[in-house]
Amino acid sequence: MTTGQGDAVSTALITGASSGIGESLARCFARAGHCLVLVARSSEKLKALALALAGEYGVRAVALPADLSQPGAVPALAARLRRRHLTIDVLVNNAGVLAHGPFVEMTAQHQQQMIDLNVSGLTAMLSQFVPGMVARGRGRILNVASIAAFQPVPSLATYAATKAYVLSLSESLAEELRGSGVTVTVLCPGITATPMLSSAVEASAALARLPDFLIGDVDAVAAEGFQACMDGEVIRVPGALNQAATLAGRATPKWLLRRIVGAIGRTTI
């Protein structure tokens, strides 16, 4: 069992692993023979998933519940890994939170929660684990962003801004680490059938009317992210429709793009 970088058995740490894209990514890595460290806030779901994956694929799967939005959570997680003599070869930063609605109607607490997890937590994980990968001369990083990273999204203003940060940081880090043996991939999915989407639909009747062809299959999205990570691809946008939308957005003048996305946001988000 290898990661394709010459090491015998690799360990993949996946945040936000208890459901959605994170859970599907955990299955992808387990299927490929990687040992797993699963991180999320939901202790019971995490432990059940670890047991299921260990039984199904015969890999070691460790559940380490943690809230990465909290100060000190990342160093504490690293200390727990050291006590278990676990070295992380693949880091998957998938944990994230979404809150939608007009900016002025959202509480400062909701805004800060997105920044604390989507930006600060992810950055802390990179700062904690990337130096060791570079020192060892091998490693893979998969950061999960969104197609919202490519354009302003009124009604998802802060969320889109956090994902733009993830995209920019990932691209910059990929170039910084080129030639080091450590690769950086950023996965930018569109709307995907996850518990996060289900929660958003409950809060927005308009979202419930989205046609099925606009909603990506979570396992297919995860499979694309896994393969892109293994291939060392820098940016992966799953799905032809999302790829076309991203290209169209980049070719559209910014002022017009803001108007278009704003109009869509006012009617569907």
Enumerate the predicted regions with their spans.
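Conserved glycine-rich cofactor-binding loop
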Residues: 18-19
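Conserved glycine-rich Rossmann-like NAD(P)H-binding loop of the short-chain dehydrogenase/reductase
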Residues: 32-49
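The beta1-alpha1 cofactor-binding region of Rossmann-like NAD(H)/NADP(H)-dependent oxidoreductases
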Residues: 43-44, 65-76, 108
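Substrate-binding pocket helix/loop in short-chain dehydrogenase/reductase
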Residues: 102-103, 110-115
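Active-site helix of classical SDR
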Residues: 126, 162
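Residue(s) in the substrate-gating loop at a strand-loop-helix junction
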Residues: 146
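C-terminal helical subdomain
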Residues: 186, 208-245
